[in-house]
Amino acid sequence: MATAIPQRQLFVAGEWRAPALGRRLPVVNPATESPIGEIPAGTAEDVDAAVAAAREALKRNRGRDWARAPGAVRAKYLRAIAAKIIERKSELARLETLDCGKPLDEAAWDMDDVAGCFEYFADLAESLDKRQNAPVSLPMENFKCYLRKEPIGVVGLITPWNYPLLMATWKVAPALAAGCTAVLKPSELASVTCLELADVCKEVGLPSGVLNIVTGLGSEAGAPLSSHPGVDKVAFTGSYETGKKIMASAAPMVKPVSLELGGKSPIVVFDDVDVEKAVEWTLFGCFWTNGQICSATSRLILHKKIAKEFQERMVAWAKNIKVSDPLEEGCRLGPVVSEGQYEKIKQFVSTAKSQGATILTGGVRPKHLEKGFYIEPTIITDVDTSMQIWREEVFGPVLCVKEFSTEEEAIELANDTHYGLAGAVLSGDRERCQRLTEEIDAGIIWVNCSQPCFCQAPWGGNKRSGFGRELGEGGIDNYLSVKQVTEYASDEPWGWYKSPSKL
């Protein structure tokens, strides 16, 4: 029996609130193309209310209720949220799959990661108190100095549709751990589980206004949030083009932003690999999450000596991937998120073919699936570096292949991109792997694997992939401001000015 999509409202000041204009957006199951529910369509007026609620929560009781509360207080709520996520894991995973098309096994894995992320930042919230008032050594003995780390304030969090609840958690958990209050705007293409997060927060008694959730279109809710004068920082994950707009809207107020944008990441495979292992990692690196990963290693840079064998094995493996309704047991590739994304990916493949590339396999709808936004896992060869398929992010299950002969050529091809989120190198030569980790210009490098991600390690990229790092111990610092406190600690007068004569 299909799980019903709960009919939620916006979540503002700890309560469900109908959108000001009373509008709602359809939720479409990408596996069936059928509407399965609705989400509220928030607009600027709703964003105003959410920001006001966040500001009130930040300042309530002079900050003692949240922003200046002991880290252990905030940690208690984060751990309670984590426990509820695990309690509702099956329900949430199913909702995620219905909403965005992710295979159910992957969605369940995501829910474990969501809970783990809240637990991790709960620990950092507690340890933050121990890091306060850290002394600074000074060259003058008559001064003492220490540092405080304080919440940056009200933060606007704008998140994508490929990992709806997990990507939201990457921002919500550290922001709340730091003592910030937040307004979350998830993607209109996949907001269902983020609204369920609101229900979880209500259930655990999170103080009103600490987390507010406004769903709606990017132009109607996301844009007003990123430009809002009451928001002290914006953190965004999404496309390069939208990231530019967010930077521009924040610039007049000199508002800090952190951006995790697109990628066109390389995976370099040398001729000394175990071919079967390397083929699986190569396909996993591009086809995991239906190919909709910002860090997808979608440019295969393959040594010429093994190119023929490797490509033959990739095609065989790709044809063996189960493409099905993502609720089916064993599904390993579901539909892409929307009709718009489906048409965009088909156009990428068509353009590559028209420019002279060869479609080794895939690029079309599976014959056994008449409905849904499905595309077979696709491998494209005979690619030139000037082609669109090499240069632009597809965000779908499409892998392009380029061959190389020397290590220097491989490095040049790997760095031949405006992006710099991630990269992978597969080789049995550890020294070679080390060289490439240093040479590839990216924020994340995987060695003999692709796509592992742990909340304990920082995540973020270079170049047009954005700036700032999420996760890891530094993840909480994204939402903290450093305050220097310096004290004159001598009984002697400063003595810079001559004291006036006493009458």
From Swiss-Prot:
Family annotation (InterPro entries)? Ald_DH/histidinol_DH (IPR016161), Ald_DH_C (IPR016163), Ald_DH_CS_CYS (IPR016160), Ald_DH_CS_GLU (IPR029510), Ald_DH_N (IPR016162), Aldehyde_DH_dom (IPR015590)
Instruction: Recount how this protein's activity depends on pH.
Output: Optimum pH is 10.
What does the entry say induces or represses the expression of this protein? Following submergence treatment, transient decreased levels that recovers after re-aeration.
Tissue expression notes: Expressed constitutively in roots, embryos, seedlings, stems, leaves and flowers, with higher levels in young leaves, and lower levels in roots. Strongly expressed in inflorescence meristem during cell division.
**Tagged with keyword Membrane:** no
The annotated consequence of gene deletion is: Reduced crop productivity, but increased accumulation of gamma-4-aminobutyraldehyde (GAB-ald) and higher 2-acetyl-1-pyrroline (2AP) biosynthesis, which influences aroma.
Motif Microbody targeting signal: chain residues: 501-503
GO terms (molecular function) for this protein are:
betaine-aldehyde dehydrogenase (NAD+) activity
Enumerate the residues binding NAD(+). 238-243
What metabolic or biological pathway is this protein involved in? Amine and polyamine biosynthesis; betaine biosynthesis via choline pathway; betaine from betaine aldehyde: step 1/1
Kindly state the subunit structure of this protein: Homodimer.
**Name of the protein this chain belongs to:** Betaine aldehyde dehydrogenase 2
State the gene name recorded for this protein: BADH2
